[in-house]
Structures are given as structure tokens and as C-alpha cells.
């Protein structure tokens, strides 16, 4: 039950980058997760093809949500969450051994290095991305690197939905910022 979205009849996203901000517990991550799951992504993260599950704890909000897309369908996509990144990194390494993804050796790197590697290796034009608090793993310099990568990818037709507390990411030029504070959107 998220007060900020409980009375919503619809929400239209018109910009390539939408940032969700608000206090802890305001429902940002729950809303993002529901959007990602409604779009067909694994609740723990990854691509639409990732079917692993370590703990079934996602919100049922996705069942009450209907996504209506424009005429252009995303060719690729990724759901990247700071809180379940270890599980996604493990899955990425399994897929790397099979030659399906380029992200190998993630557990041998720092959290920030491996997180940025996964993010960068999956950024493609005309794709759909859900990022949940990416700043949790990244230094300010790496946040700027990610911001530039997102900017380039968005300029090539990709759409991003990002939950963040980071003033660096909240400073994204031209992004739509939605606050879930105070029980309203």
C-alpha cells in the first residue's frame, strides 16, 4: 500500500529519463519493481530472460498495474537493483561461462566496479531500463560516468526509470523528477 500511488488512475511518462525521489519507505522502489515486473522483468533484476529466484518477496502491485506502450517497442532492457545485485552478479557469471553475456569475474571486483560493468555492458539504444538506487554502489565519480552513459543511451531512444537519492543523478539534464513524499506523487 503506497499512499502516493493508491489514488492514481494513470501516469504518463513523456521524457526519456524519469527519476523517482522521496524519503525511505515512500514506495519508490516498490513502484519501480512493480513497473519492471509488469514489463516482464525478473523481480530480482536482470533481463526479461533471467528466471532465477532466491526469495519471492516482490510486491503484488504489478498485478494491479497495466503498462501501455507507444508504437516503438524496446529491443532490449534491464532491471538493475542495488539490493539484489549479488544475486544478479552470480547469474551474470553463470551466463558468462555459457558465453551469453560479457560480464565475467564480477565477484572478484569491488561492488562499484562490478555494478558499473553490468550497467555499461547492457546499455543499448532503443531499450528500456529500470535502475533502483544505482548510487548505492557507486562513488560520485562513477555516478557521473553512469550519468553520461545514460545520457548517451537516452539520446539514442532508450527510456530510463531510476529511483535515487543522489543529488548527482537528480541533476540529470531534462529528466522528469517525481517525488513520492507526503503520500502523493
Explain the meaning of each model-derived region.
Residues 109-133, 141-153:
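GG-anchored amphipathic helix commonly corresponding to the ABC/SMC/Rad50 NBD signature/C-loop
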Residues 141-159, 166-185:
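C-terminal lobe/lid and adjacent interdomain/linker elements of RecA-like ASCE P-loop ATPase modules
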Residues 76, 125-128, 154-161:
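Loop/turn-to-beta-strand initiation segments
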Residues 25-26:
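ATP-binding Walker
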Residues 1-9, 14:
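N-terminal pre-Walker A segment at the start of P-loop NTPase domains
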Residues 21-22, 133:
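The Walker A (P-loop) glycine that initiates the GxxxxGKT/S ATP-binding motif of P-loop NTPases
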Residues 17-19, 29-97:
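ABC ATPase nucleotide-binding domain signature region
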